[in-house]
Amino acid sequence: MAPVGGGGRPVGGPARGRLLLAAPVLLVLLWALGARGQGSPQQGTIVGMRLASCNKSCGTNPDGIIFVSEGSTVNLRLYGYSLGNISSNLISFTEVDDAETLHKSTSCLELTKDLVVQQLVNVSRGNTSGVLVVLTKFLRRSESMKLYALCTRAQPDGPWLKWTDKDSLLFMVEEPGRFLPLWLHILLITVLLVLSGIFSGLNLGLMALDPMELRIVQNCGTEKERRYARKIEPIRRKGNYLLCSLLLGNVLVNTSLTILLDNLIGSGLMAVASSTIGIVIFGEILPQALCSRHGLAVGANTILLTKFFMLLTFPLSFPISKLLDFFLGQEIRTVYNREKLMEMLKVTEPYNDLVKEELNMIQGALELRTKTVEDIMTQLQDCFMIRSDAILDFNTMSEIMESGYTRIPVFEDEQSNIVDILYVKDLAFVDPDDCTPLKTITRFYNHPVHFVFHDTKLDAMLEEFKKGKSHLAIVQKVNNEGEGDPFYEVLGLVTLEDVIEEIIKSEILDESDMYTDNRSRKRVSEKNKRDFSAFKDADNELKVKISPQLLLAAHRFLATEVSQFSPSLISEKILLRLLKYPDVIQELKFDEHNKYYARHYLYTRNKPADYFILILQGKVEVEAGKENMKFETGAFSYYGTMALTSVPSDRSPAHPTPLSRSASLSYPDRTDVSTAATLAGSSNQFGSSVLGQYISDFSVRALVDLQYIKITRQQYQNGLLASRMENSPQFPIDGCTTHMENLAEKSELPVVDETTTLLNERNSLLHKASHENAI
């Protein structure tokens, strides 16, 4: 180690040498910065400048020189030190010839007035950057551009120094002029915007109109719609050509609109935003919303404009359309199959004018080819059928009539073996009393039996029925299950009515139907059903032999022709039981040797009678009037209606009431207990007092054997009361209830029920004996 203070280089020699070399360089740099900024950092120094923004066209050219438009406001970003100490009067610009002569001089001999420095704003916290606002004036007409350089000074009264680098240069160029007057510019933009909307709307409206739909409108639309469709349909057939023309026109108009807006506004961003908003709102949304709802009317009224643009774009759009036709084929038109058509009708039901029944019929007709007879047939076990060995007596014919069917299958041995068809009209000349065998009728008419297979479609079945062979068919299928040979198995019946019901989707009911639906077996209301079995004489109630047909005729005649027996007074059920009561239907054998025998007289003049008579068979002589006029009558003539409702002259004071018996029965709605008491009391009087009986003023004498109906007043009144009991089983009086037992206690009339009240044998025999004694 060397001694201290010995010879050699001083400690740190190399480092100290480098520091001594760097010191002069640092001084030179600081001097240069001071000379460029014309002041110390405390006075403010500008290091650089670049373009921040402007309100017109501006930017930087490829050489890095800033260019701005005349008559604009330019914001320049300045960088340096202590920029907050720099005021606007320390910054200016001078005009230079070109960038090459910029270095020849550093002094600003003449400041320009074309650039006006406003102020320095937005200075940063460190005073290292700020924005200089500069206003550019308009160039002279002979000038298209000028070049300016930045000039600065350190003091307000100091000399101006010019910057000599390209960063300090500023080009001011002439503002691009409009190639059209302002009013024409705006008018052209408006026209293009309207055309853009028309093309966009027609593109949606016309292309949405299907050629098939246009043909439909031509045939079934309104007069105006037909006229519109006739105008549009020829050009709509050329779908691709029309599409290309509309799209080319739309693109051309939108492009031109954007260029005009850019020229009018002068800013690229604003032009793009304005054209986008205008095209979207006025060129797309509004016209498409309008044409989607009124495409037919808009397309017809703009047909000339459409044809014009088709002609204008023909050189380009027509070849393109042919290429589309070649590669894509012809336009696919809307065609609805059965399922789509049915679904369309269902979906549009709230908007069309079809009622539900019409919609059901259309749906049923469309489903005709998809359903089979097995879907609508009546199962064999639910069919009404008749044996081939049946006898057509009253019971059998009543059963046939009660079934309500007009075509009845005839089977032999078992129901699946159907051999004939019986039509109800075949029985028109058949007398039930003859007990004709059914085979006699079926062999005489020999109606063909029509068989169909279970998978037969309903449209084919309808065609078979239309041929008139039969309106009823037997449904069968080939049963090849199990061992043995296949055989035909009968499944059920199908009729023309079943097919029609399936078409109209509703049940057809007439007065003879028993079921609303053969498949659901829902029965029809039986309020109109006639029970022919009630006229059978199997119970031997009638002592006089009378045919069920004559009994039925007498019942209907009394109920409809004789007001005293109308259903409003006596129910049909009570009337029928009254007719079947013993001694109501009587016979009289005529004695040829004693024509004026007393028993031949049904009525004798001036003698009391309390009965009504209806002639069923035979002939009588009637003598009436002071002149003793005589005339003959026959079947279904009747006498003594007044005897049924006459009022007794000696009413018992024990039953004071203002309402007589006959009057109360004339108004069945009134149910006063006093009336009931009057009925009971009057009944006893009629049975015992001759003075209360009807006195006939005519005579009726039999001329031949007679069969007639004889109804006494007692029976008639009991029938009235029974009918009232049937509708109202209790008589209310002053909020209380009088039962039938109490009514029986007040009179000799037995307890009123459906049997004893209507037909009291003891009273009937009493009246009969009284009548014979009176005669």
UniProtKB/Swiss-Prot annotation:
Keyword terms, alphabetized:
Amelogenesis imperfecta, Biomineralization, CBS domain, Cell membrane, Cone-rod dystrophy, Disease variant, Glycoprotein, Ion transport, Membrane, Phosphoprotein, Repeat, Sensory transduction, Transmembrane, Transmembrane helix, Transport, Vision
Q: Which Gene3D superfamilies match?
A: CBS-domain (3.10.580.10), Jelly Rolls (2.60.120.10)
PROSITE patterns in the cross-refs: CBS, CNMP_BINDING_3, CNNM
Stored Pfam families: CBS, CNNM, Ig_CNNM4_N
Expression (tissue specificity): Widely expressed. Highly expressed in heart.
Where Phosphoserine occurs along the chain?
660, 664, 770
Glycosylation, residue list:
85, 122
Intramembrane positions? 241-261
Annotated GO biological processes are: enamel mineralization; intracellular monoatomic cation homeostasis; magnesium ion homeostasis; magnesium ion transport; visual perception
- Any one GO MF annotation of this record: sodium ion transmembrane transporter activity
Subunit structure as annotated in this protein's UniProt entry: Interacts with COX11.
Q: What else is known?
A: Shares weak sequence similarity with the cyclin family, explaining its name. However, it has no cyclin-like function in vivo.
Q: What is this protein called?
A: Metal transporter CNNM4
What organism is this sequence from? Answer: Homo sapiens
Query: Its gene?
Result: CNNM4
